[in-house]
Amino acid sequence: SQIFSEKVKDKINEDLSPTKNLTGLHLKIVAAIAIIWSLFQLWYASPFPFIFNFGMFKGLPARAIHLGFALTLAFLIYPISKGKKISVFDILISFIGAFSCLYIYFFYDQLVDRGGVLLSIVIGDSFKLPIELIIGSFGIIILLEATRRAIGLPLVIIAVCFLLFSYFGRYAPEIISHGGLSLNRLVGFQWLDQEAIFGIPIGVSVDFIFLFVLFGALLETAGGGKYFLDLAFAMVGKMRGGPAKAAILGSGMTGLISGSSIANTVTTGTFTIPIMKKTGFSKEKAGAIEVSSSVNGQIMPPVMGAAAFVMASFIGVTYFEVVKHAFLPAIISYIALFYISHLEALKLNLKGMDDVDVPNLKKTFVSGLHFLIPIFVLIYMLVYLRFTASYSIFYATVSLILVNLVHLLIKNSFSKEALKIWFNQTIVGFEKGALNMVGVGIAIATAGIIVGAVGSTGLSTNLIIVIESIAKDNVTILLFLTIILCLLLGMGLPTTANYVVVASLMATVLVDVGNASGFIFPLIAVHLFVFYFGLMADVTPPVGLASYAAAAISGGDPLKTGLQAFWYSLRTGILPIVFLFNHELLLIGIENIWHALIVITTSLAGILVFTSATQGWFFNKLKWYEIIIFLIISISLLSPEFVLNKFYPKYNYQETNKINSVVLNPKKEVRFKITRPSPYGE
């Protein structure tokens, strides 16, 4: 099985490698550009520019260089269509894309001085050549084509719709119409400003995300990915349904540093899925367990697919606050997934792996202790010392490179061969990190088009009116509409771009319409809500790209794999609905340690009971009425106030005109619900 697993891994890696069609000089050029990009990002994050007073970059120019690298590499590694080779035309487009970005770097001061007025060059007596309009237009078009090649059509279609809406706003339905932006204003705002394509999302990509992806690539090339997987098998391989539990644990550990549930599925699934199949899981269930665990890896602090840093910037809170609130739902969701794998093993009467196939726990743990040092450095600096994410990940990356050097020197008796291996591993890590960032960086930049369109047209305000008109005071309809939009908008996007798109459109809407309906939703709860359901798009058929990746490895049916993964992920889907109403699940309003323990215990019990209900199994198969009882118990445990309010309402509602006849207790809370007419008189 080990040989088979290695063959599968090699085949999948070959199929998904961005450089699979490259050879000779072309491959060397791509590798060189990728390595230079990684070095630039390390320099930008380091304290050296300030120490030497050299090579300092302002925000917008740094973002432009970042996207310039991504666009250049995109056209050098992704052909115009599958089966084609990179042509001279592709190389030309990559140069034009790079120039469109570098123009911002070279002429940044002039752009600031002109305050948004685009430069035109007068030719002859009267003809004006709108040079910046042309550069910006080329930049946007090239970005969209790069997105089509690297990510796919869905995000391109969404971005084009928002661009058309920005320009033709006056022709839109009255409820969302606006005056429309001129072509100059549209291109200038989208390409030459730092509110759209070069806005907060790509700023976070420059500051943090690239380095996290680079950290993951360096860890993988040093052998960290294999170590975590071996450790997972050593810990749980002998348990009932051990390979499934190992897949969950391994995906959780690699998901801590991975920026994509699809990449996570491929990385760990090439090892775990064949072994799950061998021990008795069906093709679809093996793939679905891997998909569910990989998606769960993206909601796990401290990194959360790098979306945690964007979330902190969007909400205006510290990174630590985001991690603190996201911690409990992620942990109990993961424990519930372990429970699912156990229930499946009970259903199928599966045993654990044979002793001979399971690595020795002590030897395995000790063999890779050095991999834990840079991860400890990262978490210690982020969570305990509360340093910035860019500062923390820079020093974690440097510590990883140095720790790997020391390990190889000791392992190879301080020989020159050790230095050679270390240098090669580091260079390959730099190359892989940059190539892995191409799709992520481009997706985030294109998501910036949507952010810019929402900001420049007032669309979020109009969306509030539209959804309020549809949902009225019915919070169920409001949440249903939000979930559907998140699933549609999150199709096929990397985790961070996914969050940027759904949060920019839906977060404000959910807060405002929720308030109008009499519900006060904390901002962090709303952002985590849209983040969770945006991620569910990776699982949910018919798109569910992570399910397709798992099916490619397992040989199963992609649609059946997706449906099974969706069913497994119901526990992840219920949590954001619960924590919108029960804020204690996000550790909001916790008064002391005992209060926290009660919340953690009841939440964990609730999600496990809910999982049993959805899987129809406890110690044995549940009858239909037992499933209903389990669901009621789970809701009571997850949201006690919701159930108590049905029997003992927290508030005694009175009409305003009767308020004078009510004797108010000065020690009790009073809430006023204020309604306002919609633009349509409702």
Language model feature labels by segment:
Residues 144-179, 200-201, 222, 226, ...:
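Flexible hinge motifs at transmembrane-helix junctions and intramembrane kinks/re-entrant loops
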Residues 145, 150, 160-172, 183, ...:
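Core transmembrane alpha-helical segments of multi-pass membrane transporters/permeases
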Residues 1-127, 133-137, 634, 638:
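Conserved, well-structured core domains of diverse proteins
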Residues 1-25, 34-35, 324-436, 548-638, ...:
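Long, contiguous bundles of hydrophobic transmembrane helices that form the permeation core
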Residues 215-218, 253-254, 295-300, 443, ...:
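Hydrophobic transmembrane alpha-helices
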Residues 129-134, 195-208, 235-247, 279-285, ...:
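Membrane-interfacial loop-to-helix junctions in multi-pass transporters
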Residues 516-519, 642-682:
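Low-complexity, proline/glycine-enriched hydrophobic segments characteristic of transmembrane helices
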Residues 229-297, 303-308, 316, 495-534, ...:
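Hydrophobic transmembrane alpha-helices that form the pore/transport pathway of multi-pass ion
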